Amino acid sequence: MRMRIRNQNNHLHFPVAEAGLSPTHFQADTFPPSFRKRITVQHDGIDTDLVAPKPDAALELDNGAKLTRDDEVVTFINRNLEPYRGYHIFMRALPELLKKRPNAQVVMLGGDETSYGARPPKGKTWKQIFIDEVRDKISDQDWTRVHYLGRVPYDRFLSMMQVSRVHIYLTYPFVLSWSLLEAMSAGAAIVASDTPPVKEAMVDGETGMFVDFFDQVSLVEKTCKLLDDAALRQKLGTAARQHIVDQYDLKRTCLPKHLEWVDQLAKQPVLGPDQFIS
């Protein structure tokens, strides 16, 4: 019943819709065939001129310290830190990652609310729930290398991506995060969950490395592999950026296609009420 109620908006609008737009095939393919055939897949686009590698980038932490590309920085981003985007998996892998990487600085970005999945018990946050779950497995000294930024202005987000040595992206089969594409555009080396929306944007071994969503051991192993191999990081990061420039560039690819879609739609004859597909 809950799902039917959530779908009512689409059911009310699609019978009178002549066309639809979806940023990904994964999202478009969630619609019934009668709706899907009218949906054009075209991503919003990434400003690859703005979101680009920056060798002299620096990220200032809340404690005043600055991280640069000379530091071993591991990054993780959610709009809000929650299980739907793999926060719990990342946190459960964190104790072992910190043990194996004594010089790593782990930087996490995201709010304390809930964007997509189930809400935490009243009075709690998913962020703190999973901190509490793993904190006794992490020494006080190692915990000083874990940095929560909360929500930040866009320029600070960009700096975080530009200093990242390895970026970790995890998600259930759901809407693809724009931050993954921005990380690729920034030339980051990425370890990402082997889930359908991710596979639409990345190729394992070519533009990033895949890991089973629930496999914390493999997540740590592949992150360490990238941290140990500068040449592999460079190869994957360069290919990831080129893919975004070729397929997702806002100004040269996506925006022109959006305008073309609008122009073609405007040229179609206006349908009468009895001509729409139910």
Task: Give names to the regions the model predicted.
Residues 172:
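Aromatic "clamp/platform" in nucleotide-sugar-dependent glycosyltransferases that forms part
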Residues 189-192, 202:
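Short hydrophobic beta-strand element within catalytic cores of glycosyltransferases
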Residues 204-205, 209-216, 225-230:
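Conserved acidic donor-binding segment of nucleotide-sugar-dependent glycosyltransferases
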Residues 231-267:
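A charged, aromatic-enriched C-terminal amphipathic alpha-helix characteristic of glycosyltransferases
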